[in-house]
Amino acid sequence: MDVLELLRASATGSYTALFSDAWCQYVSKQITNSMYLYCALGVLSMVFLAWFMYFKRLARIRLRDEASRSMSAVNSSSGGDLRGLRFRKRDKMLFYGRRMLRKMKNVSGQMYSSGKGYKRRAVMRFARRILQLRRDNMPLEMRTVEPPAEYLEETIDGSDRVPPDALYMLQSIRIFGHFEKPVFLRLCKHTQLLELMAGDYLFKITDPDDSVYIVQSGMINVYISNADGSTLSLKTVRKGESVTSLLSFIDVLSGNPSYYKTVTAKAIEKSVVIRLPMEAFEEVFQDNPDVMIRVIQVIMIRLQRVLFTALRNYLGLNAELVQNHMRFKSSTIMAPSTHSSQCSRQTGSQPTLGVPAPTCSNTTTTASPTTANTVHSGLAGANGVIGQSRPPISPSRHSREEHTLSDPNPNPDVINTSVGGASGTSMYAEVHGDAPNVDVFHQQQHSVGNLSTRRGSISQMAPDLGPALSQPGLGQGQGLGPGVTGAPPLMTGAPASKIDMRLVHASAVDSLRKELGLPEEDSHIIEPFVEVRELEPNVTLITEGNSDDVCVWFVMTGTLAVYQANQDAARAKQQQEKNDMLIHFVHPGEIVGGLAMLTGEASAYTIRSRNNSRVAFIRRAAIYQIMRQRPRIVLDLGNGVVRRLSPLVRQCDYALDWIFLESGRAVYRQDEISDSTYIVLSGRMRSVITHPGGKKEIIGEYGKGDLVGIVEMITETSRTTTVLAVRDSELAKLPEGLFNAIKLRYPIVVTKLISFLSHRFLGTMQTRSSSAAPGGPVEANPVTHKYSTVALVPITDEVPLTPFTYELYHSLCAIGPVLRLTSDVVRKQLGPNIFEAANEYRLTSWLAQQEDRNIITLYQCDNALSAWTQRCMRQADVILIVGLGNGSHLVGKFEREIDRLAMRTQKELVLLYPETTNSKPANTLSWLNARPWVTKHHHVLCVKRIFTRKSQYRINDLYSRVLLSEPNMHSDFSRLARWLTGNSIGLVLGGGGARGAAHIGMLKAIQEAGIPIDMVGGVSIGALMGALWCSERNITTVTQKAREWSKKMTKWFLQLLDLTYPITSMFSGREFNKTIHDTFGDVSIEDLWIPYFTLTTDITASCHRIHTNGSLWRYVRSSMSLSGYMPPLCDPKDGHLLLDGGYVNNLPGQLWRYCRASMSIAGVFPPFCDYRDGHLLLDGCYTNNVPADVMHNLGAAHIIAIDVGSQDDTDLTNYGDDLSGWWLLYKKWNPFTSPVKVPDLPDIQSRLAYVSCVRQLEEVKNSDYCEYIRPPIDKYKTLAFGSFDEIRDVGYVFGKNYFENMAKAGRLGRFNQWFNKEPPKRGNHASLNEYTFIDLAQIVCRLPETNAGNSADIFSEDEDCDGYISEPTTLNTDRRRIQVPRAGNSLSFSENEMDSDVELDLQLDRKTEKSIHSAATSVARGSMRSREFHKLEQDRSVEITRLKDETERIMAPTNLDRKGDGQEQEKEPEQEQELETEEPNQENTEVEEEQRNQGEGNEDNKENKGGAYNETKN
């Protein structure tokens, strides 16, 4: 706020305008140019004091005279002199005793007339009450509690009790999945101990690669050998770590053991190594085939999540991960159309890190069968990024240059081609549209990706095809190279009419049989599942991230192109390019699509036909059926994937590690050697620094996709912090040696890291200067407020947790894909025994898959400490503790147990308030003080439907309709959703005196522009306006209160009465405090609807201070304490003196106190003393008048900063090296000379005070997270409060035009849009059906189903209370179907699931179908007799049982609790009838319904046991 023209006030009447303006100008000039006024004020004060003392003494003399006259009258009447008389001591004691007894009657509590020491106790109670009077009058303070030691320290348990060799063994083979104890003991029998001296080789080139090595003591160096004889270290293996390649493990199991070609391991010092031969696993797998299947699946998952995630997303390697150039198996099939393609295909593989690429001659060579069998052509179909992948690192223009290192004559089509034009039509829309029996298994598809399998020799197909395929003269086939003549018609682009399709199908069956490694006598197994299709150019087979169209494709003719999304979407958009880039081609004789068959992931590639092609394919469900009969094809599929990978991937497999960390375990510790970096695959990490004094402080937190320790590894410095796991986490470890080897071979890696580190350092520089003040809360550190998993815990049973979760889910859907999980959902999806220890691997894998597919996953806990609740605690990044704001704040036993179980997880409190109440949040401090473990709180205003008591069925039915509507982005649920996903929008209001009325107009413009406000911060007048908005959230009420306060500030006669002797300030601040206190009352910052902070200048600690809790009016007053006019506010917390925060940052208890503190203009109002610590607080504008940087540190992703402060004149006169005051006086008074602009002494002092504020303001203007706005209000003075309406209108008009221009320019989307508004596509949106984890061991080996037939009996009472079953059907779609709605129109988990999950497809004959339709219609109208309907239901149950038995013969049993779903189908028509005939007495109706459901469940248990589609009967 300005110091100049402080006493000037606008005239209240037109007839006094001239006089008041002249008087104000005169007074302002006197204040500016001389000190006479100060002396005059002092003299007036002394005269007033003397006058007051004189009249007070005169009044005392009068009273004394009257008393003497009265005494004289008494003496005269009594005839004696009473001057010497006095009270006796006994009379005095009696008098004072009676007075005390009268006061003792007011003491609370019963006075006992007997008992030892009762009088003493009564007196002590009375004294205690008197002593506590002042403490009770003080406002309630927030209790500051240091976080527990476990929050910042790693867990150290008794793991030393396990023998070291067994412990290291367990940790090393954990990468193969979960092993039962007998299996582990059998593996231990095959271990060998190797003792190596320094310099001894553990293994070297040409040694067989057939063992797993675990270092028990010492150190081993793993390095690669270059062609010139030099070596390059990959990693150093220390105690407890292992050396192995999972890709070699698959080679050994498939019967093709390899040897070390470039990798060598040598002991650095004396070491002891445990050797576990891979053959030991073969022996175990023979007796436990399910273990083999699970190990293969785990290896494939690791291949996706670790290798592809690390190498692609962070190092920028894409096409280098697969062998781009493959050779044909037969000379009759030569697809390349250019010499370079033929040449590159002869090389057969990518170069390794240490071996240069081979060159090819100009002659075309035919690959031999042996060589062709060596090089497999599968495709690694996914990169491990599941669902909505994290924002990838953008490749530069040089992303293709590394190919020239391995191929001197690269094919431009292969290397530098990007996709253009349309993406092509869908394969299932154009290719499969008119074919019968296409969608046989379409309804049963899960989320899987691409898989590579071995190719069969196409030349071997010709003898089986008869004379039709050996006719010469058919010419060149499409897609074949020039000079390739006489190709069989099957392998050409000849029209299908010229070829017998039966022969084509037979050829396709034989080829796919060989690819799957099946003998010839097993052709009948795959023959029914093989389909052949003709493709036109640019037809899309599958898109990246899609799981619906997953198949194994075999290319018979033509060419398929494999693309991947361009990671630098912004650069591609600027260059008008497509976001897809070519990875490689798939030629005739090769297969593609299938890694997800083993992992359950979606496709990471987009596959299109390059030209006219013919492909044979097998759908995913058919592959699983074949696996069930021939489990060994899993090895063939896995071996095909491995052989397709480039040697670079195999070398990286030796160095990259997959690390599992339980909650509390440390990744690395402070001061350790930095020899690697880590990639967070799942979970959450916390970085903690230990200061020399032993104090620990949080530096930051890392979530999924973040790099940890990269800066220290690159700079080769020791670890500066300790990083520990907040919850169970998975990480990929990238050693420094591997990183150096890759960057030497592929310079693109350096470009990637420079881009990554530049963004990280830029963010650090922008937030460094605005870190929290000393003594600030832990959460004030720059912690990433973006969570992947959220656990919801009710405080009491009265909390409507299910409706709350639905509302939060609804709001989160506006941001991205989200999933809601409950214990019933998980049981129905995976079985009732899923929470047992034996199913740990399956459960964690399934949950990890769901988390990867969604931006956020909601875990709804039970109301008791069940196994599911404990699992939610382990999986959660943050825990939301939900309570009723009007209820009791006491902590229950269940809540304390949660704090004990999740000691390190961040917890936030959510208080719910009904919309019908007119009250505002109150007593929030009592909630927070009772829960010191809570780091943040949210006030949520709930609609009426949340608190309406309904059965679970009615809740599901209600929200199935609510989800079809658009969420209200201005609601508290949307605000909470944006906070959880890191999309909060902050509003920062700067200081500027009366010009702050423009904030009201800007608030109205922001509201009309549809921009939600999630957080508010303010300084000086901005603190006042921001606090009004957070308290009211109604622009009309805010305008009214702001106008009333401005009118009070125009009453200059009240301010004159507040004048005081100007030692500290000109005004005492009493009247100013009263105006702010009357505006807010005794409201605390914690009780505001919207998170709020104000900033003040702490002159006690010489820093700015951020207030997020405490007295509102006090800190607002302190932030407005302009120096010289008001005294600093004394902080009651620590006694520090606080001034206007604008002195350090001019844009940023009880509410009014900190508002007052933020308005303490130095010199005008005294500093405000903080009641907590006694610090003196002044106006925040002295340090930061627009604290947008503070808002960014508190978690706001997008910020709108409004600046209304004054601007200094920078056009000053250059007067030379010295300055004479007499010369300035002459220039000032001489009208014939040009005026000079030289700052006077007060102006210089003001500019010095605002130095840091101006610097901070420039940083805010240049930041990328802030939208800086300055309305045109420079013509209004600081104290022009009488022009409130005019200034407000200026701000409104300017803001409205500003946001309209932003909308036209397309820049408004970041404030009100966070996702693509296009309608959701089924292939790209998360559905619980689509991403169900596929346990191959259970499918293939017929393991006992965890969801046995009696699972419906266990949960029969709950089936009608939860309608979230997501069940894929396994029935053919070429038959007639009837869609029966499930109970309650179950709420889906995504937009596309609303179509697929709500309806259950049943296959019925015509008669039953017609009867069911008739029955459903009659029930809906309430006109059908129960007996007739029950008879039809029995008929339907029999029909469903028959169909179930029929489909079970061809399909593997699903992991769904179908019986529970069947019960829901049975009850749904009855519940529809109940809704229409519902009696007013809802309570009795619900009791009758519960009894009827129990009766139905009991009868069902007797009637149907073990059936998968058993139905209930009344």
UniProtKB/Swiss-Prot annotation:
Keyword Isomerase: no
Catalytic activity annotation: a 1-acyl-sn-glycero-3-phosphocholine + H2O = sn-glycerol 3-phosphocholine + a fatty acid + H(+)
Pfam families: cNMP_binding, NTE_Ploop, Patatin
Residue numbers binding a nucleoside 3',5'-cyclic phosphate 1: 175-302
Chief site of localization: endoplasmic reticulum
Domain of life: Eukaryota
A GO term from the CC aspect: plasma membrane
Cytoplasmic side: 56-1514
Short sequence motif named DGA/G, residue ranges: 1140-1142
SMART domains to which the protein is assigned, alphabetical: cNMP (SM00100)
Active site residues according to the UniProt entry: 1020 (nucleophile), 1140 (proton acceptor)
Chain positions of motif GXSXG: 1018-1022
Positions where Phosphoserine occurs in the chain: 457, 1234
Ranges of biased composition (kind: Basic and acidic residues): 1425-1449, 1456-1470
UniProt short sequence motif GXGXXG, positions renumbered to this chain: 991-996
InterPro entries linked to this entry: Acyl_Trfase/lysoPLipase (IPR016035), cNMP-bd_dom (IPR000595), cNMP-bd_dom_sf (IPR018490), LysoPLipase_patatin_CS (IPR001423), NTE (IPR050301), NTE1_P-loop_dom (IPR056556), PNPLA_dom (IPR002641), RmlC-like_jellyroll (IPR014710)
Membrane topology of this protein: Single-pass type I membrane protein
Region (Disordered): 337-418, 1409-1514
Family: Belongs to the NTE family.
Function noted in UniProt: Phospholipase B that deacylates intracellular phosphatidylcholine (PtdCho), generating glycerophosphocholine (GroPtdCho). This deacylation occurs at both sn-2 and sn-1 positions of PtdCho. Its specific chemical modification by certain organophosphorus (OP) compounds leads to distal axonopathy. Plays a role in the signaling mechanism between neurons and glia that regulates glia wrapping during development of the adult brain. Essential for membrane lipid homeostasis and cell survival in both neurons and glia of the adult brain.
Protein name as it appears in the record: Neuropathy target esterase sws
Organism: Drosophila ananassae
Source lineage: Eukaryota, Metazoa, Ecdysozoa, Arthropoda, Hexapoda
Name of the gene this protein is made from: sws
